[in-house]
A protein has these predicted regions:
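Metallocofactor- and cofactor-centric catalytic cores in central/energy metabolism, strongly enriched
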Residues: 1-158
Length: 158
C-alpha cells in the first residue's frame, strides 16, 4: 500500500538522498492540567507566515529556513505574507484561518471556550531538513510562551 508518507519520503530522498528523518519516539506528552476556559492559547504555525514589515523566510536554503517570526496577537490579515513554497496556497488565500485560525480562536474566547489569546503567536517554515537549529529556535519560542503564561500552543502544520 502506498501512503502519503511513503510518497513524501520518496520525494525528499530524490531531492536530498543524504536526508535522515528525525524520529521523536520519546517526546513527552504534557497533559492539560486545567480546562480550556481557564487557559491562554497561542497559535504556532509552520506555514511560513510573516509580517510585511519583517524579513521573509528563505525557502531557497538547502536545509530549510529554521528561523521564526513573531505574529502579534492583534494581527491584521492584510499585513501577513506567505513565503512557504512547499504547499498549495489556494485555500489559504481564500481564508487565512485555514492555516492561522485567529478569528476562530477569538470566537472561542468570546464564547468562553478559551480564557484568552496570547499577545504573540509564532510562525516557522515547514520543509526543514536540518532540525538541529530548528530545535534551538523552538526552545526559544517555548521559553517565550512560558514567559507569556501561555498554557496551550495550538499547532497548525502546513
Amino acid at each position: 500500500m502506498i501512503t502519503s508518507l511513503k510518497i513524501t519520503t520518496a520525494l525528499i530522498k530524490r531531492r536530498r538522498p543524504d536526508f535522515e528523518f528525525t524520529l521523536f519516539r520519546d517526546t513527552p506528552v504534557t497533559p492539560l492540567c486545567r480546562p480550556l476556559n481557564k487557559c491562554k492559547l497561542a497559535i504556532v504555525t509552520t506555514g511560513g507566515l510573516y509580517l510585511k514589515t519583517d524579513r521573509p523566510f528563505d525557502p531557497s536554503l538547502k536545509d530549510g529556513d529554521c528561523s521564526y517570526r513573531v505574529l502579534p496577537g492583534d494581527i491584521n490579515f492584510e499585513n501577513l505574507m506567505i513565503s512557504h513554497k512547499w504547499y498549495n496556497h489556494k485555500f489559504i488565500h481564500a481564508d487565512l484561518n485555514c492555516l492561522f485560525p485567529i478569528d476562530r480562536m477569538k470566537e472561542y474566547v468570546q464564547k468562553g471556550v478559551i480564557k484568552s489569546l496570547s499577545e504573540e503567536h509564532y510562525s516557522f517554515m515547514g520543509h526543514i531538513y536540518d532540525t538541529v537549529p530548528l530545535m534551538r529556535h523552538a526552545k526559544k519560542v517555548g521559553k517565550r510562551l512560558k514567559d507569556l503564561d501561555v498554557d496551550v500552543a495550538f499547532l497548525t502544520p502546513a
